Amino acid sequence: MKKMLIGGIRLYQKYISRFTPATCRFYPTCSAYGIEAIETHGALKGSYLAIRRISKCHPFHKGGLDFVPPKKDKNDDSGHTCKAHHHH
């Protein structure tokens, strides 16, 4: 599934995007973001992140730097705030 989605984005980049004016208001571009999101988070969550990014593409959003969030390690509880599990 990941390969199909990324393949679709690459087809867009090769056959459509290169023939349109560069108007992306974000870095990285939405297509590059989509590929990275799918590679990092898998087909389902990556697609969700890509769609969410594309939905920001309108004149009322300032754009700018918008990187794919890192994948959270399921065993990493560094963001966990409950102190009940921590022993000193």
From Swiss-Prot:
Residues 69-80 have a biased composition (Basic and acidic residues). It comes from the Bacteria. Its main location: membrane. GO terms for cellular component: plasma membrane. It is a peripheral membrane protein. SMART domains: Haemolytic. It is found in: Cell membrane. InterPro entries: Membr_insert_effic_factor_YidD (IPR002696). NCBIfam families: membrane protein insertion efficiency factor YidD (TIGR00278). Belongs to the UPF0161 family. Could be involved in insertion of integral membrane proteins into the membrane. This is Putative membrane protein insertion efficiency factor. It comes from Listeria innocua serovar 6a (strain ATCC BAA-680 / CLIP 11262).
